[in-house]
């Protein structure tokens, strides 16, 4: 048995144990493939979301829901550097995707003033609702900033509150999910003896990406009563953890 294979099997056991202890809907035993009113989920974000998209793709497929990642390495943000280039393509991409829900995980590039952040998040809300979808902002995992990120930490720390203000004025078209339930309030590289976050202080490792996926599917089940997430054992051991994106873990 290969080292990678052994790791993924261990991850599966961990997920099942965690979900069973929490009463997570992912372990209800209900059959997969019941999307209810949730037909397609689109993920937006930066390279952190790129890694999380790997188990998400497997989990949504097992749950009978279409999934598409528009997350991007070195970008994917709607405010701050590179965002102008992203906006040139994003409206057409979302229109073509025809999602039910768009998940925007706040990125490590969401730099800008409060006014700039609010304008961008308002624009995202208008764009998402314009294609008939609901917008879910998700807070980013806490990072351990290096010299590149340190000057922008005030912007990143403000971003969730700006997103909440936009959601509060959206008449129910947007919501903010606090992923601190998954990550805690500070960067933690190792959890339960296994690498959960990358040593670079920014990205996730397979265990962390899988825990996030399990949590997100449960939150969607709360909001779409007809949606039954597949049990973790059906998607946590399907080979995605061997992707090169996790080579730093």
Model-derived regions: residue spans:
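Bacterial N-terminal signal peptides that target proteins for export
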Residues: 1-11
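C-terminal motif of bacterial Sec signal peptides marking the signal peptidase cleavage site
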Residues: 17-20
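Bacterial lipoprotein signal-peptidase II cleavage site
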Residues: 22-30
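Conserved SGNH/GDSL esterase-like catalytic core that processes O-acyl groups on lipids
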Residues: 37-120, 239, 243
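Stable alpha-helical elements in mature extracytoplasmic
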Residues: 52, 56, 86, 90, ...
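Active-site segments of SGNH/GDSL-like serine hydrolases
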Residues: 109, 127-157
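Catalytic His-Asp segment of secreted/periplasmic serine-dependent ester chemistry enzymes
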Residues: 143-249
